């Protein structure tokens, strides 16, 4: 396994651990999710280029589109929560209340 793939795999696992560790703030969780999506994008791009898959060359672009949609939905949720409650603590949110 090349060194760049090992580094990207470590970046993915570090960002995934960041989601688990920093789950008290919504902004920190969103940043860690963006890190995972970025490392997944780079890994799929490198694997597509190295293995010469012509049919799956659109897979990184599709992943990037899903990452942009995830970021937009996350930011909309962050703005809504911070306008409603005044802070972005996930622990203070209760989904049972309407």
Curated annotation (Swiss-Prot):
InterPro entries, per the entry: NADH_UbQ_OxRdtase_chain4L/K (IPR001133), NUOK/Mnh_C1-like (IPR039428)
Transmembrane segments: 2-22, 26-46, 59-79
UniProt keyword RNA-binding, yes or no: no
Catalytic activity: a ubiquinone + NADH + 5 H(+)(in) = a ubiquinol + NAD(+) + 4 H(+)(out)
Keyword annotations: Electron transport, Membrane, Mitochondrion, Mitochondrion inner membrane, NAD, Respiratory chain, Translocase, Transmembrane, Transmembrane helix, Transport, Ubiquinone
EC number: 7.1.1.2
Protein's cellular compartments: Mitochondrion inner membrane
Coiled coil: none
Gene3D superfamilies membership: 1.10.287.3510
GO cellular component, one term: respiratory chain complex I
Top EC class, one word: translocase
GO biological process, one term: ATP synthesis coupled electron transport
GO MF term list: NADH dehydrogenase (ubiquinone) activity
Keyword Cell cycle: no
Membrane topology: Multi-pass membrane protein
Function, in words: Core subunit of the mitochondrial membrane respiratory chain NADH dehydrogenase (Complex I) which catalyzes electron transfer from NADH through the respiratory chain, using ubiquinone as an electron acceptor. Part of the enzyme membrane arm which is embedded in the lipid bilayer and involved in proton translocation.
Subunit structure: Core subunit of respiratory chain NADH dehydrogenase (Complex I) which is composed of 45 different subunits.
Family: Belongs to the complex I subunit 4L family.
Name of the molecule in the record: NADH-ubiquinone oxidoreductase chain 4L
